[in-house]
């Protein structure tokens, strides 16, 4: 798609360029919103550099605690293993298990630098020729504007590019160029430029694509015409449900311009669509609230904290600071906040109060058990690789035995340490647990009973002496069997597997049930700590407390994510905001 470009009155540096001699006029364009506009799959022998240094994000660092201890009578240096469910553990396990590989860098034949100042026609011609010689690219205009957008080049440089293109194409500028120019306008918060393009688009088009609306909304909220962004939001609703970014922009705009009622109405509308709001949206309400002395507003902020709890959401570090600032600004309440941690015992290191237990109540357990049995196990999909006959055989097997204390995913456990024979490792785990007089169930596959380099028949016979065993067909899924056996045995039963059960959690029907499942998982899944060959296996302690936003009325405890710690969805933060009222 192309457009005839006759100029825009707000582009004086473009259309009145001394290099190009173009006069004033009008142009029309459709817009889209993108997080970045870089071009992938560049030629190997070509690299891009800007003439000015680029800002880079801080490298995510995770502190690795190391300590010395005596292990079973021998002096060994042991690396502390992060708890299975604590933030950063998955990344650290990945780093510990990965092998470093050297990757040779492709040779760079030539480099082309992005301009940092407007170029004239001859300079753009030369840059285009240089690119063609180095890479063979013929789509110079599209490529260079993508790189400029990705590197957030200046508006004036982008204008000179558009002017050069217009001069060489009888006033025609492609859609792609205009789109990425507008992206730069929004990024650099050039509101007047966005407004002028908006006026032209209103005159030219009856409707826009959703991404175009999104870019206009983001560009307009900082202007005195921000309410027109709300009209664009209504236009989006005629086609699709607006995104959480659309709502975030409109809410931020409303708060920026002191329209609190509109902001809360948009927030309720967002929740009504079952959209999880951006954390920066929630943070904006707290930032705005420190200047408002209104009980109704305060109650709504407390509702946001309840929403975080019910949906197991964790604020970032900056958001946590905003929450602390708001609490301490509430007149007459004398709230005092501090950033702290929770001890292994479940006590807050700051105030000494006990954090909620990780164990489910009997009512919660029965509710979760029923929904897992119905939605995860009896739903059918989880057993698509299991025959009805085998499923029936397993159910009869479980019902014919007393409840188990520990259910072991045999194949998963056996493969935890690659340098150890699989049957030997499984026997080691079973033997240590059997010494504690625990009733054990090992779930495995039939191939584990066949003699091989990894599976000793003698060791597997010993496993069967110390534990009940069920060996499914080799194509069967293990996890549903493990869930069924553990839940059927009762709330006391634990299970061992490295699997984080993400798929099964996703099968559950609502956020509340998913939260109960994750809480149950944290309180019942045992993890084996890595160790040296020949040393005794160590089972990692189960967290005693529930990492979730919680209150006792005169105190709040809010877990939050540190800025420099990567946390996957199956992990929980280690840092807490402790808030309590002074007495």
Swiss-Prot record:
The keyword Transit peptide is annotated on this UniProt entry: yes
Annotated effect of mutating residue 485 to V: In COXPD54; decreased protein levels in homozygous patient cells; impaired mitochondrial RNA processing in homozygous patient cells
Entry cofactors: Mg(2+); Mn(2+)
UniProt free text on domains: Displays a distorted and non-productive active site that probably switches to a fully productive state only upon association with TRMT10C/MRPP1, HSD17B10/MRPP2 and pre-tRNA substrate.
UniProt-annotated binding residues for Mg(2+) 2: 479, 499
One record GO biological process: tRNA 5'-leader removal
Protein name in the entry: Mitochondrial ribonuclease P catalytic subunit
Disease named in the record: Combined oxidative phosphorylation deficiency 54: An autosomal recessive, multisystem disorder with highly variable manifestations resulting from defective mitochondrial transcription and translation. Clinical features include early-onset sensorineural hearing loss, sometimes associated with global developmental delay or primary ovarian failure, peripheral hypertonia, seizures, muscle weakness, behavioral abnormalities, and leukoencephalopathy on brain imaging. Serum lactate may or may not be elevated.
Subunit annotation: Catalytic component of mitochondrial ribonuclease P, a complex composed of TRMT10C/MRPP1, HSD17B10/MRPP2 and PRORP/MRPP3.
Modified residues (Phosphoserine): 98
Pfam families, alphabetized: PRORP (PF16953)
Species, as recorded: Homo sapiens (Human)
Biological function: Catalytic ribonuclease component of mitochondrial ribonuclease P, a complex composed of TRMT10C/MRPP1, HSD17B10/MRPP2 and PRORP/MRPP3, which cleaves tRNA molecules in their 5'-ends. The presence of TRMT10C/MRPP1, HSD17B10/MRPP2 is required to catalyze tRNA molecules in their 5'-ends.
Description of what induces expression: Down-regulated following mitochondrial unfolded protein response.
InterPro entries from the UniProt entry: MRPP3_PIN_dom, PRORP_C, TPR-like_helical_dom_sf
Record-linked PANTHER family: MITOCHONDRIAL RIBONUCLEASE P CATALYTIC SUBUNIT, PTHR13547
Binding site residues for Mg(2+) 1: 409, 478
UniProt modification remark: Degraded by LONP1 following mitochondrial unfolded protein response, probably leading to inhibit translation in mitochondrion.
Binding site for Zn(2+): 348, 351, 557, 578
Residue stretch of the organelle transit peptide: 1-45
Reactions catalysed: Endonucleolytic cleavage of RNA, removing 5'-extranucleotides from tRNA precursor
Family: Belongs to the PPR family. P subfamily.
Leading EC class: hydrolase
Single GO MF annotation: ribonuclease P activity
Cofactor note: Binds 2 Mg(2+) or Mg(2+) ions per subunit.
GO cellular component: mitochondrial matrix; mitochondrial nucleoid; mitochondrial ribonuclease P complex; mitochondrion; nucleoplasm
